[in-house]
Every structure is written in structure tokens, then in C-alpha cells.
């Protein structure tokens, strides 16, 4: 009788089935991880802009003169120090009223962010009293810590 050299067809089919089951579990979990990390990245991108807004308002610069961009600031106009497309996942916008109330938003773009985040928005909202709140239109599972839905 000859010694066996290799695997039988059934053994190979079992290995392929096991790999398929593991992939069916791992791929959705990885996609969820990516969506959560994108939310955290977006918030980390816009969170430092609060400091620039607060400094500008405390120097007496009107809220409507606080703009997005990296142009040098002047005595009457402040640029927050980032371009609208600073993060490849989406677009940043700053809209502050003269009262000091306003929003810093991050809008996820379709095609560059996870499909689970596409067109979702993270907003840092400032009241005229200087209180900041974070809101998100993301699924609660993907919303960064410190943000509400």
C-alpha cells in the first residue's frame, strides 16, 4: 500500500469552509472598526479649531470674520489654520455668527470614507454663551466618544 502524499478533497473542502466562516465574521467587524476610527479621526481634526474660535472671539474679532483656511490672520479677521479638505475623509466648514454662536462641521464624503459614514456629519456647536456641544448624524455605534446623536 502506498503512503498518502497530500490532502484528500474533503480535507481541503473543510479548510475552505472554515476560512469562509472566519471571513464572514471578521470582514463586517473590520468594517465597523474602520467606521468608528473615521469618526474619531474627524472629531480629532475639528476639535482643535474650537481653541482658535475662542481665542478670536476673546480678542474681539466678530464671529463672521472667523474663516476656514490657512491664510495669515489679521487684526480683524482670523483663519482657523486648516483647509476645508485637510482630512481626506471629508470637508470641514466653520460658520460662526457675530453673537459667537455657530458650528464647526465635518461632512464625510462618499467614496473617500466608509460607506457607513458617507454623507454623515459631525458638528461642534457653540452657543452665544460659549458652551460647546458635539452632535453627530452617524449611527450611534460609530459616533465618537463625547458626541451625541
Curated annotation (Swiss-Prot):
Disruption phenotype: Mutants show a significant reduction in the efficiency of extracellular protein secretion. They are also defective in twitching motility. Coiled coil: none annotated. One of its GO terms (biological process) is regulation of calcium-mediated signaling. Residues 1-6 form a propeptide. GO terms for cellular component: cell surface; cytosol; host cell endoplasmic reticulum membrane; pilus; plasma membrane; type IV pilus. Disulfide bonds join 134-147. Signal peptide: none annotated. It comes from the Bacteria. It is found in: Fimbrium; Cell inner membrane; Host endoplasmic reticulum membrane. The modification N-methylphenylalanine is found at residue 7. InterPro entries: N_methyl_site, Pilin, Pilin-like, T4P/T2SS_Core. The chain crosses the membrane at residues 7-27. Pfam families: N_methyl, Pilin. The keyword Transmembrane helix applies. Keywords: Cell inner membrane, Cell membrane, Disulfide bond, Fimbrium, Host endoplasmic reticulum, Host membrane, Membrane, Methylation, Transmembrane, Transmembrane helix. It is a single-pass membrane protein. Changing residue 79 to A: No effect on pilin-pilin interaction because the twitching motility is unaffected, but weaker Mat-pilin interaction. Changing residue 65 to A: No effect on pilin-pilin interaction because the twitching motility is unaffected, but weaker Mat-pilin interaction and less detached pili during PP7 infection. Methylated by prepilin peptidase PilD at the amino group of the N-terminal phenylalanine once the leader sequence is cleaved. Major component of the type IV pilus (T4P) that plays a role in surface and host cell adhesion, colonization, biofilm maturation, virulence, and twitching, a form of surface-associated motility facilitated by cycles of extension, adhesion, and retraction of T4P fibers. In addition, plays a critical role in type II secretion of exoenzymes by interacting with specific components such as XcpT or XcpU. Modulates host calcium signaling through interaction with host calcium-modulating cyclophilin ligand. PilA subunits constituting the T4P exhibit a classical pilin fold featuring an extended N-terminal alpha-helix linked to a C-terminal globular beta-sheet-containing domain, which are packed tightly along the pilus. The N-terminal helices constitute the pilus core where they stabilize the tubular assembly via hydrophobic interactions. The alpha-helical core of the pilus is surrounded by the C-terminal globular domain of PilA that coats the outer surface of the pilus, mediating interactions with the surrounding environment. Belongs to the N-Me-Phe pilin family. Interacts with itself to form a multimeric tubular filament structure with a diameter of 51 Angstroms. Interacts with PilJ. Interacts with PilS at the inner membrane. Interacts with type II secretion system (T2SS) components XcpT, XcpU and XcpW. (Microbial infection) The ssRNA phage PP7 infects P.aeruginosa O1 (PAO1) through the retractile type IV pilus (T4P). PP7 binds to T4P by interacting with a single pilin subunit PilA through the Pilus-Interacting Region (PIR) of the phage maturation protein (Mat), and is brought to the cell surface through pilus retraction powered by ATPases PilT and PilU. Then Mat enters the cell envelope, causing pilus bending and pilus detachment, which impairs cell motility and restricts the pathogen's virulence. NCBIfam families: IV_pilin_GFxxxE (TIGR02532). This is Type IV major pilin protein PilA.
